[in-house]
UniProtKB/Swiss-Prot annotation:
The keyword Cell inner membrane applies. The chain crosses the membrane at residues 44-64, 67-87, 108-128, 136-156, 185-205, 212-232, 246-266. Keywords: Cell inner membrane, Cell membrane, Membrane, Transmembrane, Transmembrane helix. It comes from the Bacteria. It is a multi-pass membrane protein. This is UPF0761 membrane protein YPK_4186. GO terms for cellular component: plasma membrane. Belongs to the UPF0761 family. Its main location: membrane. Pfam families: Virul_fac_BrkB (PF03631). InterPro entries: UPF0761_bac, Virul_fac_BrkB.
């Protein structure tokens, strides 16, 4: 009787254990931490060029002139915890210096920013084991679209949010508290949609929408929890500040970027493993149904 109860308790957990083993094997085989380190290095190299190009795009659209200040605060508050103010000051100085660059230097900034997108593309296709190669023209078009349309869409969403909050009839309708709650989960929604687009569009193979949504949701939740945990760690255990002093912002930024890419790639591994697990179960069912006939 005890063994029967144990079997009943373990049987619902068996799919989870099997999926966990497949996920761990895949993460170990792909070298997730090494890939995340590569992307973290490229991200730090491309960070200033990427931010320069993004805010140059905002400057080209008058409707984003006022919202760009709020967007800066939103990005650094929600995507760079703990030391966002210090990093923001340094990056704004770098961006201000880059405005004095020549045309050749500006082209170099754009190429460096595109280098990050190319690296993300390469790493995700390694995870998906894709051998399909895009043409150079198509790849450049996709990279440029991500570089230009992504910031514009985020800026447009913030413009709409600010517009909704400015409407007087919302206060009378008593829905302002609901909008406040929506804006509170706005970073989570942006992360979820961004990861879903990343897992759906970047791989050169077809990715089931449901798998991409699940993987993106896990990554978005871990990203939000990671922000709070990282900020708590930096605040409660200020070892980096004690060791590095004023230079502590450098290892802290690198550590956060590395941790962020680990989360992004984990979401990608979950997305891929969901498809492989489903295919494995389908194959096992076919073997069971065919065995009596044999």
């Amino acid at each position: 009787m005890a063994s029967f109860r144990r079997f009943r308790l373990l049987s619902p957990l068996k799919p989870c254990v099997t999926f966990g083993r497949m996920l761990y094997t895949r993460i170990d085989k792909d070298g997730l931490t090494m890939l995340a380190g590569h992307l973290a290095y490229v991200s730090l190299l491309s960070l200033v060029p990427l931010i320069t190009v993004i805010f140059a795009l905002f400057a080209a659209f008058p409707m984003f002139a006022e919202i760009s200040i709020k967007l800066k605060a939103f990005i650094f508050a929600n995507f760079m915890p703990a030391t966002g103010d210090i990093i923001q000051n340094y990056l704004e100085q770098f961006v201000a210096n880059s405005n004095r660059m020549t045309v050749v230097g500006t082209c170099g900034l754009i190429v460096t920013a595109l280098l990050l997108i190319y690296s993300v593309d390469s790493v995700l296709n390694i995870i998906w084991r894709s051998k399909i190669q895009r043409s150079l023209v198509f790849s450049f078009a996709v990279y440029w679209m991500v570089l230009t349309l992504g910031p514009i869409l985020v800026g447009a969403s913030m413009v709409i949010s600010s517009y909704l909050l400015s409407l007087h009839w919302l206060a009378h309708a008593r829905v302002d508290s609901m909008i406040d709650e929506i804006l509170r989960v706005f970073p989570l929604l942006i992360s979820w949609v961004s990861f879903w687009l990343l897992y759906s569009v970047v791989p050169t193979v077809r990715v089931p929408a449901r798998d991409a949504l699940i993987g993106a949701l896990v990554a978005a939740l871990l990203f939000e929890l990671g922000k709070k945990g990282f900020a708590m760690y930096i605040t409660l255990f200020p070892s980096y500040q004690l060791i590095y002093g004023v230079l502590a912002v450098i290892p802290i930024l690198f550590l956060w970027v590395y941790w962020s890419w680990c989360i992004v790639l984990l979401g990608a591994e979950i997305t891929v493993t969901l498809g492989e697990y489903r295919a494995e179960r389908h194959h096992a069912k076919n073997v069971i149904t065919q065995s009596p006939e044999m």
